Amino acid sequence: MKNRTFATIDGNEAVAQVVYQINEVIAIYPITPSSPMAEWSDAWASEGKPNIWGTVPTVVQMQSEGGVAGAVHGALQTGSLTTTFTASQGLLLMIPNMYKIAGELTPTVFHIAARSLAAQALSIFGDHSDVMATRGTGFAMLCAASVQEAHDFALISTRITLESRIPFLHFFDGFRTSHEINKIELLTTEDFKGFIPNELVIAHRSRALTPDKPVLRGTAQNPDVYFQARETVNPYYLACPEITQKVMDEFAQMTGRQYQLFEYHGDPTAERVIILMGSGCETVHETVDYLNALGEKVGVIKVRLYQPFDSQRFIAALPTTTRGIAVLDRTKEPGASGEPLYLDVVTALYEKWGVGSLPTVIGGRYGLSSKEFTPGMVKAVFDNLAATIPKNHFTIGINDDVSHTSLDYDPDFNIEPDNIVRAIFYGLGADGTVGANKNSIKIIGEETNNYAQGYFVYDSKKSGSVTVSHLRFGSQLIRSTYLINKASFVACHQWDFLEKFPILKDIVQGGTFLLNSPYDQDEVWERLPGKIQAQIQQKQLKVYVINAYKVAREAGMAGRINTVMQVCFFALSNVLPREEAIAEIKKYIRKTYGKKGDQIVQMNIKAVDTTLDNLHELVTREYSAPPQIPNHHYPLSPEGAPPSSIPYILGKMIAREGDELPVSALPNDGTYPTGTAKWEKRNIAQEIPVWDTDVCIQCGKCVMVCPHSVIRSKVYEPEQLENAPSTFKSANAKDHDWHGLKFTIQVAAEDCTGCGICVDVCPAKNKAQPRKKAINMEPQLPLRQAERENWDFFLSIPNPDRRELKLTHINQQQMQEPLFEFSGACAGCGETPYIKLGTQLFGDRMIVANATGCSSIYGGNLPTTPWTQNAAGRGPAWSNSLFEDNAEFGLGFRVSIDKQTEIASQLLQELATVVGRELVDDILNNQQNNEAEIWEQRDRISILKQKLQALVNPELTSKAQLLLSLADYLVKKSVWIIGGDGWAYDIGYGGLDHVLASGRNVNILVLDTEVYSNTGGQMSKATPKGAVAKFASGGKPAAKKDLGLMAMTYGNVYVASVAMGAKDEHTLKAFLEAEAYSGTSLIIAYSHCIAHGINLSTAMQNQKAAVDSGRWLLYRYHPDLVKQGKNPLQLDSRTPKLPLEESMYLENRFKMLTKINPEVAKELLKEAQTDVNLRWQMYQYLAAREVTQG
């Protein structure tokens, strides 16, 4: 056996390394958690890396997974070795083509990071729902249980498909395998070449469509032959299992790693056996070893080839002593007599068991949406099998108090050996903790003889969410595919987490605790929450503290504390000699940040060099009794709330205790209340804006740009200040319309993310201190309590009357209450200010169809939602369908609302003699064109409802009841279709185009970040020429799609292109005009993004630079102007005055290319400048045309 190379990589990279080498065409589209496989392929192709045949694979990005499947089908039909990667809904979009590919016996492998399907809710996490939905397509299914298996099966499945002609799904668990980092043995180029015989490749090519040997495929067949034709493939499927095992045996001869279609592990005379597939196999494997060492007789069968299901080999793998079988499925099929694997096992046993009585077979569900699957749960399943009457169709890992399917288990059951080092790190999204820990586990895996495993837990929030890193390393193979619950090392990178989460729950006696503290060493002990003090003393922990933010700030890295904490970990863990560890950290810094420029590299290295001087051991008191220091609890704390209440449910989720919620606690249809984000109080900002009353000019700009709606302004009567807190600030209102009133700008300190955009846009200058403005950043912690009281008081002040505000004046319009607040978006997000503005203007009558993407995640991800309500209980109604159908989904809203309004109007006419003709006429004739008319209409509807409720005439009651149920539709509803550029320009463009052509009164808001932000920054058709993005590693060669111009060609669509940072009044005007327009409206909003490689605190300057250079145009196309004899296109940008280079190179996404490939960067910049010039000239021409009517 040849010497082997090891690498510490995650499952996605492990698969991509193989797939890239043995394919010629790779069609891609981003979807979590499979995207990194496509990203690696694109990056290698961009570098010119060849495959085993010496050619660089063609990597082509499509507009959707449906498009990918079509491209794959076409490439396969013309003889190329072709593959793709996907998951979840993406895989479902491929199903029609999968039937075709399989029906034509075309070899290919789709590599799937298996993920939940959107049902009552979307979930990005892992289970087998997606792959099980494809069972009827004819694709074979090969399942990998670990990173090593995923690496190996990528090669094995490709060989099998070429030999069998059966297309394959090679799948592995999303996140648990796709994103787990593990030390694996790598296959080599020689392995690939030896394992993929040329004759199989030639045979595939010989079946290609070519005019040199013309044939016809894809015919339409009639009833006389279709049935028979379907049966012709049977011999291929019957042969597939034998071919698969033969290939696995050959692989074993080459590598020493033997796989079986059904691999048994356990006692040879086992009486109880669990059958499953995927990463759960590893947990069962190690639990079987533990239980058998205690004298049990148990085993596990790991299913590798699921389809075609070889019943004979399955029976042969079972010990003949088997008396009880538990089949575990990682999916749910409501209404079925059992889940898929269970049904196949039952069928196989019934058909093939032979002599003697059948074993008892029970089925169960586990692990949906990456729900934990632990040794304690495995033991519970074995215990259930040992019961006199085992529970069938059970669930494990949840508390089902509705259908009573769940098994009880011991959550503290632990089987991990003491010689495995286990460490947990609690970080904040975007503080670099996860990235640093990925590098740490790679250093350990590659620079020591240890096996290593890294797994990272984060919710779907953007930066600012909690991340938990789980690192294991030791001298033996690590099979523990579950979270650590006994850690020898715990690091807390955010002080506030001490009050929010059970940070020290899983640390062992005598363990090491590393804490990032904002306080000096001498203050730390007194500042610790009482519960933490008690745990430190009771568990006799060694505690080390560092002010990582101070070290990072002094190194010029602001909030990026990852490098600092990484150095501390290596210094305390002793896994490597200290100097060697620091050298490796610096090596990985250069590798990780080299493309971002030497300045970033040097800042990180400076942080490394200064860290250990700031790391101190904390001297704790002798233990006597738990200190009586009150703990902080969330306003939505589960303590004190009834178990059935929404506050209790959301409180448990916020406290990271959602796993404890029973089935009965959750809504059965996925419906949740709005207005809950205000209870979360994340306290993640190190600094918050503080208002200077003397300098402020009361322009409202800071309020408008605040991405999280934490800055608010109000005017009010002076007497409202009578009970104000002593630190509450106010000033005399400066607007002439508010003479004699008081004015306040207030910040929600505990909801602020500290982005600083408000400071950047503030136009006011402090003449005494030129570096100061009317709003300035100051440390949050000393201000928190006072600002909490000030915020509560501010909310008690009545809002200004919306009917009296001048909505075209920003300072007045920003007095409107936002009905979108405190989202989980990135600090400094460029999308949310537009959404917030829409809710301020129209939120109390708004219904929103939101495409899957960033805006659906920060807008609709549990536990809390930023969409909220006003004091009257009105606010945006929000829903997300899918990524690809959002435009159609929103059109459905409009069609339905219009129909219900029509029915209500008809009923109103029919009941006019009863409710009063005058009231009916007033309701039906009200145009509802402004706030005053909307308010009047609501008052009339209230009177109407009172009259309807008073009716007692039996003949009228049914109509009255119907009208009562529809009366609110007589108030104008504002339908908004919201999504990002990945939706609008790519996957959803067909539907969007149809809605634009419909003429229906919907408002479409495209939050254009110019990349697929939600999936990690991949290229879309909105990505500008020359930008480096994932899937465009060598810089995007094509120009940005002009969505606005395409929409204008219909002639009856209102179109606006806006950039708040360039011209906020223009943005406001566009929103008002779009909503007022009676047809279809489209607003394309420039939205800066963290993926642009910019400082988000000054991102509004980037927007302005984009407009000043002509890269982004401001315009409004208003069809109604044609009726007035005017040109409908109003070009609101001025002639570009900034060279494009100066705008582009403010952003790292453009600047990176100058380092990667300077010549290409120079050429693309030249082309992009030409494109900008030509586009400006075209829009100038279009806006200057004279319009003639009729």
UniProtKB/Swiss-Prot annotation:
Keywords assigned: 4Fe-4S, Electron transport, Iron, Iron-sulfur, Metal-binding, Nitrogen fixation, Oxidoreductase, Repeat, Transport
GO MF annotation terms: 4 iron, 4 sulfur cluster binding; iron ion binding; pyruvate-flavodoxin oxidoreductase activity; thiamine pyrophosphate binding
Gene3D superfamilies: 3.30.70.20, 3.40.50.920, 3.40.50.970, Pyruvate-ferredoxin oxidoreductase, PFOR, domain III, Pyruvate-flavodoxin oxidoreductase, EKR domain
InterPro entries, sorted: 4Fe4S_Fe-S-bd, 4Fe4S_Fe_S_CS, PFOR_II, Pyruvate:ferred/Flavod_OxRd, Pyrv-flavodox_OxR_EKR_sf, Pyrv-flavodox_OxRtase_EKR, Pyrv/ketoisovalerate_OxRed_cat, Pyrv_Fd/Flavodoxin_OxRdtase_N
Domain of life: Bacteria
Binding locations of [4Fe-4S] cluster 2: 706, 752, 755, 758
Keyword Transport belongs to the record: yes
CDD domains to which the protein is assigned, alphabetical: TPP_PFOR_PNO, TPP_PYR_PFOR_IOR-alpha_like
Role this protein plays: Oxidoreductase required for the transfer of electrons from pyruvate to flavodoxin, which reduces nitrogenase.
UniProt-recorded name of the protein: Pyruvate-flavodoxin oxidoreductase
Organism: Trichormus variabilis (strain ATCC 29413 / PCC 7937)
